[in-house]
């Protein structure tokens, strides 16, 4: 069954580009928007005070209801900014005429009005869990998507049916394996194992909730897909794990048994011409500083494969040492590893090019739990969520590197990443100070970036370099100033900024 979704009042830039007179506010320019919540343009939504909007949407519903035999129509309702409604004379007049006191209830008016029209066509209404922020339309079926989908339970409390599609687990736009091997997308990981182990019915649920749960849904957004094969790659095999989540009896999950069944089914899926990901065979890594050495840890979500590795840069084979436990290195080392089953390499080869410098393996004092990545010898990729970047959101950063003893330092660099589409930018200022007692610091360098450098529209890794230092010191302190918010005209205008760093290099 194909259920149509007609988004309202937000995520409507495609229609507003063609019918700008329906926008709030009316714009005399093309309205484009990035994936997700894309800056100021995402604040442009349908005008709740303009009756022409409802006439237009009713015409759309008339056609959709005739085209699709499904008894359901999804009306969206998610991520609707109220900024322009709050200052729009028409919207304010609507609130006064309908005796609406709070702006959230204006969305309830909007959605209820359209819901009633859909119901007049003999259809049932579905919507995202933001509808629970105000009065729910009668009979609306709610999709729980934010976080782990708990907002849907607010609808269940009122006797509404609901569907679980938590972004944290069932958004298939997320990376399905170690990000080093995956096509670029956004956010974090939702691995095959994450999907399979998801339990939609929680122990603390009231008995009534389970009877109102209609099922589960995996959501696949295609902003980063340019072909059907790209979409299939994101769907399979995670879609098969979702089927198990939906159909299996509670408490019967068996990960190894599922993999055995999956191995029998995947060849059939591929004979149908589908593109299937093999990410479940790829290796996760973690490299941590430990007593002036680096500890290398490798893992794979499949328990039925062997990991073989080398430390001399050669390709691993079944004859290479088998990984049974973590190991340490104390010099520049090129580690390569891959998974094997029945003598055949199953996953892609992981390459860890561990480059040693005076900072490698040394402790970092910082507020972030994963600040160890600053001295673990591994450079990050263009994916700032690949586990090799440590980030600060909407705040300045300060961290101290302990070299262990007074050391001659001539050059220091700090790896920074820019991903303008995700509001990830270089700092405004980086200050470098030195100390030998960890109390009294002396500034020896400052890098100031211009707005043009900070907000360049690109994705890139760049090192902030302090050279010609000629100083003997034990402690290096980095003080980093956050640029604030993305400026007017930026693709993420008005959004707060992330700063990410991957490696401190000292020579």
Where are these regions (language model features)?
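An acidic- and aromatic-residue-enriched active-site/binding cleft used to recognize and process polar
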Residues: 5-11, 78-80, 130-133, 145-147, ...
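Aromatic, loop-rich ligand-recognition surfaces of beta-strand-rich domains
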Residues: 383-445, 458-507
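Structured core elements
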Residues: 3-5, 45-47, 72-76, 126-127, ...
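Short, compositionally stereotyped local motifs that mark structural "simplifiers"
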Residues: 249, 253-400, 417, 426
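Flexible, acidic glycine-rich loops studded with aromatic residues
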Residues: 124-130, 135-140, 146-295
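Solvent-exposed serine/threonine-rich low-complexity stretches and specific carbohydrate-binding patches
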Residues: 443-453
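Substrate-binding cleft of carbohydrate-active enzyme catalytic domains
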Residues: 1-125
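Flexible loop/turn segments at secondary-structure boundaries
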Residues: 9-15, 74, 80-85, 132-137, ...
